[in-house]
Structures are given as structure tokens and as C-alpha cells.
Curated annotation (Swiss-Prot):
MF (Gene Ontology): metal ion binding; ubiquinol-cytochrome-c reductase activity
Major site of localization recorded for this protein: mitochondrion
Cofactor: heme b
Amino-acid positions noted as binding heme b b566 in the UniProt annotation, renumbered to this chain: H97, H196
Pfam family, one: Cytochrom_B_C
Positions annotated to bind a ubiquinone: H201
Domain of life per record: Eukaryota
Protein name: Cytochrome b
InterPro entries on file: Cyt_b/b6_C, Cyt_b/b6_C_sf, Cyt_b/b6_N, Cytb/b6-like_sf, Cytochrome_b, Cytochrome_b_C_euk/bac, Cytochrome_b_N_euk/bac, Di-haem_cyt_TM
Binding site for heme b b562: H83, H182
UniProt organism field: Vespertilio sinensis
Subcellular location(s) of the protein: Mitochondrion inner membrane
Bilayer-spanning residue ranges: 33-53, 77-98, 113-133, 178-198, 226-246, 288-308, 320-340, 347-367
Amino acid sequence: MTNIRKSHPLIKIINQSFIDLPAPSNISSWWNFGSLLGICLALQIVTGLFLAMHYTSDTDTAFNSVSHMCRDVNYGWVLRYLHANGASMFFICLYLHVGRGIYYGSYMFKETWNMGVILLFAVMATAFLGYVLPWGQMSFWGATVITNLLSAIPYVGTDLVAWIWGGFAVDKATLTRFFAFHFLLPFIIAALVMVHLLFLHETGSNNPTGIPSNMDMIPFHPYYTIKDILGLFVMILVLSSLVMFSPDMLGDPDNYTPANPLSTPPHIKPEWYFLFAYAILRSIPNKLGGVLALVFSILVLFIFPLLHTSKQRSMAFRPFSQCLFWLLIANLLTLTWIGGQPVEQPYIIIGQLASILYFLIIIVIMPLTSLMENHLMKW
């Protein structure tokens, strides 16, 4: 008699995706982040659902409803901080996942990679919408500043901003629609994740060597399920430590002040995970130019497969490319630091140089270095 997991129409799909899935025998812990991202998404949906039961999307009561959750709801503070810091964990895993994809050449699975970049955009949009909901000072002014950037679009910009706001300023209509979209988007993300996995299982996983591993595969369960559970425990440890000991470490103190349209905070800045893009936006003294640079800082990921000039897929055996990769990481950390600083010298010039270097490394220096390495291998 055939095992039920291999014959049942529904369980069969799960079996082929998570149990009997052939996986390369040499994938390292850098391949753990896909499963961690799935767990982060599930955590965000569950905690978000319970928070939505107590939240009111009205400008008069939104701030107080969040306060009420933390004070009066049983373990409401745990839900709230799990959700807020869960978003930070989500982005840490996302950036590590993308970084691994760049380092090991996983972007050569074009459909999977492009789907992943679309997912990144969707998660960033969801996080931005969620940051507006507590209706603190930084929520209100962040929403005002970021949505206002759309007015840089020629001809339709001003109308588009008024349309998104639902009026002539960020107000009740804006908050209500932001809540509606923030609730909806995670389910769209979950559907996109299914497509992402569908494309991945068409080709199979990449591995650290970048060499096809069809002749050396092992079943996903128990080998990689156990390995993923270890990663999960590490993430739970980090997240629970954050939530229990310093839940506000990654937040902004300004968001504990109710939104006031008549008082602008001294430094308007987004959450830490957007600071690198915010620094690129601010480094260009022209509104439209800044918006384009901001969008292209993420869109540039789409062209990675086109910029791959090396004969080797992975960077594992390419020391010069490795140096450039870590230079890019250092550059991104510099941009993240600059994004949180006031707009004054020397931060302005550092931000401008780091922004130029960011695009230069990806579009020019990395492809040229790969070509040079191809020639070195002939010797």
C-alpha cells in the first residue's frame, strides 16, 4: 500500500515540497533564511490579526488604542512588541537572504530571483504602511514625507498624492486605507511566496560551490528540517530577548508622542531597515532625482543576472569579487548610519559618496572585476 503522504492529493504537494524534496548535500546555514522568513511571515500574520482586534483606524483613537493594548489587554504588550520587533527580524533575515543570493550567484535562477525582488518590494510597502498605524509623531511625519515624494512624478504627481491621502493632507482617510492595505498585503505576500517556491522547486536549490548538484542530493527531511529548527531556535532566542529586555531599542522615541500636524520632529527618519534607501534619497538635492535613486536602489537587484560576467556562478572561489561584495556590505552599513544622522556636514558628503559607490560597485566595478577574474583563470 502506498504511503498516504505520497498518494493523498494535498499531502503529496507538502511531501514533495518539504519532506522528499531532493536538496544539495552541501548547502550551509546561509540557506536557513528562507524557512526563517516563512516563520517570520506566519508570526507577523498571527500577531497582526490579534492586534487588529484591538486597534481602531481613526486619527482620534489610533494612538490610544495602541496604548490600551499595551496596558489593558492580557499580554497585549507581548503581541505589540513581537509584531514590531518581528518586522525587524523579518528584514534582518530578508537582507541576509538577498546577500546570500548575491554572494553565491542564486540570482541566475531568474524567475525565482525576480519573484524574490517583487516580494522585497511588497514587504517594504507593508512595513511602511504598518509604521504609520500607531499614529505617533514619526508615523504621521513619515507618512507625510514619503507619500509626498510621489508628487515628484511629472504631470500626475500632485493628483496621485491627493488620491493616496484621500484629501489635502495625511488624515483620517489616509489612516483608514493604510490599515486596510496593511492588513491585506501580508496575504498577497503569502501567495507570492508560493509562486517563489514554485519557481525554486522547478530548478532546485543552488549550493555554495555554484556547481550543479544533481548527482549528489539528499532528502530535505530529516537533514534540513533539523538544521532549519536550529536556525529557528536561534531566531526565537534573539527575538524574545529583544521583546523581553529592550523592546524599544529599534524604535523611535518620537513615536510615543501622539501625531501633531503643527509640530515637526527635529529629524524625520524611517525605521532602521529603510535607512540605507533613505540616505540615498537624501543624498541627491533634487526631489525627482532623489525619488528615482531611491527606487533604483532596490530595482537594481532585477539586473543582477544581466550583470553577471563571470564564468563561475558563486563567489566562493573569486577573491577579488569577495572583497567587492564585503565592500558593498560595508557601504550599505555606512548608508544605514548616514540615514539616521541630521542633514549637515560631514554627513551630507559621506552620504553622497556612499550612494555613488553603491551604484558604481554593482553596475560597473563588479562586472569588470568578474571579467578580470576570467582572464586570471586562464593563466
